[in-house]
């Protein structure tokens, strides 16, 4: 799980990875016979019994640096990824982060560029809010309106949804399923919640090099069992 690909120097959250560190991390995958792909591609491959050697790569929040900084590195390594975007904030910034530096978000042109390069465009909701705190109508808006908006923009209904802040419960997962998505990405889903609408992910940071990547991969695989 990635977020912004840029200079991480002033990021208090540790969610920014420099392009050269992303390059190192993808080289680490390649050296072990692993290829980064979108979540939709990974799930289809697993369903067909051919998921071996594939790793799902996701980029949350839809930062504008994805097209300029992440895409060239992904292409260099023959990888694809899923970009989770916020249709209600296109061309805006990460206003939900009170302490971090303001970072621009993708606009419509950026999304089309990413999609044309083979990136899976998926929904992160409309505005990056904790969905578990919303009433029924607001939750439906975040899930259904964001899907309709992205469908119109890309000409293709998004298959995936990513829960802002990674927070999900049974009600939210059910709303995502009802909206027509094929899967939902969390971080560490609560106990008792599993399946395609509560997919666990592992955060990758600037600090992650060979030893840490190995430990995180083992931890992630163990957690999926």
Language-model features: locations:
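C-terminal active-site subregion of NodB/CE4 polysaccharide deacetylases
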Residues: 1-58, 64-67, 133-225
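Histidine-centered catalytic micro-motifs
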Residues: 4, 121-128, 164
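A short, flexible beta-alpha/helix-coil linker loop
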Residues: 5-8, 88-89, 127-130
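Acidic (Asp/Glu)-rich catalytic clusters
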Residues: 30-31, 72-78, 104-123, 177
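Generic enzyme active-site microenvironment
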Residues: 58-59, 122
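Structural detector of well-ordered beta-strand residues that form the stable sheet scaffold
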Residues: 82-84, 122, 182-185
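Surface-exposed cleft-lining segments at the edges of enzyme active sites
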Residues: 92-102, 129-136
């Amino acid at each position: 799980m990635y977020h912004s690909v840029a200079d991480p120097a002033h990021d208090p959250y540790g969610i920014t990875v420099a392009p050269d560190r992303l390059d190192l991390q993808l080289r680490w995958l390649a050296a072990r016979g692993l290829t980064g792909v979108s979540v939709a591609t990974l799930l289809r491959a697993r369903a067909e019994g051919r998921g071996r050697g594939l790793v799902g790569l996701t980029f949350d929040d839809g930062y504008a640096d994805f097209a300029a900084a992440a895409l060239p590195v992904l292409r260099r390594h023959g990888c694809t990824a899923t970009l989770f975007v916020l249709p209600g904030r296109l061309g805006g910034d990460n206003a939900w982060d009170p302490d971090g530096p303001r970072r621009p978000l993708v606009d419509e042109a950026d999304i089309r560029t990413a999609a044309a390069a083979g990136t899976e465009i998926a929904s992160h909701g409309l505005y990056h809010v904790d969905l578990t705190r919303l009433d029924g109508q607001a939750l439906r808006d975040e899930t259904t309106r964001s899907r309709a908006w992205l469908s119109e923009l890309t000409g293709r209904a998004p298959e995936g949804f990513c829960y802002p802040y990674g927070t999900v419960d049974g009600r939210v997962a059910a709303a995502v399923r009802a909206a027509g998505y094929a899967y939902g990405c969390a971080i560490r889903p609560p106990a008792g919640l599993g399946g395609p609408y509560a997919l666990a992910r592992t955060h990758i940071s600037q600090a992650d090099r060979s030893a840490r990547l190995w430990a995180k991969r083992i931890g992630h695989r163990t957690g999926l069992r």
